[in-house]
Amino acid sequence: MLSKQIPLGIYEKALPAGECWLERLQLAKTLGFDFVEMSVDETDERLSRLDWSREQRLALVNAIVETGVRVPSMCLSAHRRFPLGSEDDAVRAQGLEIMRKAIQFAQDVGIRVIQLAGYDVYYQEANNETRRRFRDGLKESVEMASRAQVTLAMEIMDYPLMNSISKALGYAHYLNNPWFQLYPDIGNLSAWDNDVQMELQAGIGHIVAVHVKDTKPGVFKNVPFGEGVVDFERCFETLKQSGYCGPYLIEMWSETAEDPAAEVAKARDWVKARMAKAGMVEAA
């Protein structure tokens, strides 16, 4: 029987940098986490993972089996550099190829959810044409994901196009495909002028995972827990009361800190204390 404990994971970029996944998963286990979320960002180093050999992919699978710590999700932020909404056909084609490779990678190693960045373009000016291309790119991506039985899940972003669950639901309704769902970030959601509790309730039935971090208006990264605007207890209460039973992922960027493990342990204890206050006793 599967445990009723709330699945709590940690973002790869919170842990010491490096390419040894056995060491990373062992550390995550020592720190009390159930899973680690992989990052495939716009750097050449992390993008190269999508070209891993069969042996490299098998090494990741073996590390998961050996440690018992899962890698069920991928944060695919590489589309900042190669956006699906780009008006440059070559750049957009690269974005679609990255999506194809990411879906194949996920299928090979057992990743179930690929979190998408909700940017039509990031470094360029957005317009109606970039949004149209983005929609068409998502449609093509979801078709690929459907064939592979891999879920694509849209993050609620630090960007106006996708800064609320309501906006992301518009894309879910447009695509009308069970392999496209939502992956809200309660930090990003809280940093905008949103009714956070109503937004979370609106997403129930489409939320496959939740990012946990603190933010301030206009500051979306590296805000210490408890120093931002997020009402964690209310968010956890709302999700619990709405029937959400899925995973929570602590998102941090402490991989270059003096002692990443200590930073992560401190954040873990802080988050679990708020979960306990919200009545999520399994996380206490």
Curated annotation (Swiss-Prot):
Name of the top EC class for this enzyme: isomerase
Keywords linked to the UniProt accession: Isomerase
GO term, biological process aspect, one: L-ascorbic acid catabolic process
Q: One MF term from GO for this chain? A: L-ribulose-5-phosphate 3-epimerase activity
Kindly tell me the pathway this chain contributes to. Answer: Cofactor degradation; L-ascorbate degradation; D-xylulose 5-phosphate from L-ascorbate: step 3/4
Q: What is its EC number?
A: 5.1.3.22
Which is one Pfam family of this protein?
AP_endonuc_2
Name the catalysed reactions: L-ribulose 5-phosphate = L-xylulose 5-phosphate
Induction note: Induced by L-ascorbate. Repressed by UlaR.
Role played: Catalyzes the isomerization of L-xylulose-5-phosphate to L-ribulose-5-phosphate. Is involved in the anaerobic L-ascorbate utilization.
Regarding protein family, the annotation reads: Belongs to the L-ribulose-5-phosphate 3-epimerase family.
The UniProt entry, under PANTHER family, shows:
ISOMERASE (PTHR43489), L-RIBULOSE-5-PHOSPHATE 3-EPIMERASE ULAE (PTHR43489:SF8)
Q: What's the name of the protein?
A: L-ribulose-5-phosphate 3-epimerase UlaE
Native source species = Escherichia coli O157:H7
